[in-house]
């Protein structure tokens, strides 16, 4: 068997793994009612964007079987796409990323720290809690990414403290805002995730989680999110 055939088969296997993980993540979000489509008033993100949909990954911590499955898939993604040997410390972003970072660090047998949004304002004035050796290679873990803006502060804090970071793992990536990858890309950080809203809406439509009229609204938003406003 030639090297070319072998490399193609490995790539295909990885794509199958990604598709399985995306479908599992989408199904869990819908089954746990962590994926929302608005009824009366659209959702507003911290960036000021309006959206007919919202994902709440924080709810997943209350579902033991679901979170175990997702952590297994997250570790599979990390080891496949980043490499265990490329990570010295797992860092959770305050606050939603902390629990997921802890579970991932435990599964991978790695130290963990968490990064505050701002220095705590007293004592050591620390923004990073835990032990992070100078030059350590960190993986930032967060629950989700919309436009990537909130990750910038965490990345800067890690680097200012002497850490090295080139990857960020999220459970969910909206997948519709180019800035989410370009902003981090400009900082030399690659974004990894299990699923996007495209995966969720396909699963929702296939299994009847959302009625047809809501599916249409979501697809309109996903195709043109900038400046979206509700009709009527």
Residue ranges and their predicted role:
Residues 2-31, 156-232:
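PRPP-dependent phosphoribosyltransferase catalytic core
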Residues 2-84:
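Active-site-facing substrate-recognition patch
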Residues 48, 90, 112:
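Conserved hydrophobic/aromatic pocket- or pore-lining residues that grip, position, or stack substrates
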Residues 84-94, 169-170:
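Short glycine-rich phosphate-binding loop at a beta-alpha junction
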Residues 88, 136, 166:
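Conserved acidic residues
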Residues 98:
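Portal/gating segments that form or line small-molecule/metal binding sites
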Residues 101-139, 147-153:
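Short, glycine/charge-rich flexible loops or terminal/linker lids adjacent to PRPP-binding catalytic cores
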């Amino acid at each position: 068997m030639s090297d070319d055939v072998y490399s193609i088969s490995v790539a295909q296997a990885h794509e199958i793994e990604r598709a399985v993980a995306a479908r599992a993540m989408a199904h869990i979000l819908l089954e746990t009612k962590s994926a929302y489509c608005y009824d009366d008033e659209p959702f507003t993100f911290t960036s000021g964007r309006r959206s007919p949909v919202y994902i709440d990954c924080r709810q997943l911590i209350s579902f033991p079987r679901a979170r175990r499955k997702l952590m297994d898939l997250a570790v599979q993604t990390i080891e496949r796409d980043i490499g265990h040997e490329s990570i010295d410390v797992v860092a959770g972003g305050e606050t939603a990323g902390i629990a997921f970072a802890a579970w991932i660090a435990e599964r991978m047998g790695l130290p963990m720290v968490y990064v505050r949004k701002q220095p705590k304002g007293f004592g050591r004035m620390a923004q990073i809690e835990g032990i992070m050796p100078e030059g350590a290679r960190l993986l930032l873990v967060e629950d989700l990414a919309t436009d990537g803006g909130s990750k910038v502060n965490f990345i800067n804090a890690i680097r200012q403290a002497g850490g090295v970071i080139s990857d960020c793992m999220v459970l969910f990536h909206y997948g519709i805002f180019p800035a989410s990858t370009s902003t981090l890309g400009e900082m030399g950080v690659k974004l990894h995730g299990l699923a996007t809203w495209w995966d969720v809406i396909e699963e929702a439509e296939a299994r009847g989680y959302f009625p047809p009229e809501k599916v249409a609204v979501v697809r309109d938003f996903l195709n043109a999110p900038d400046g979206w406003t509700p009709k009527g």
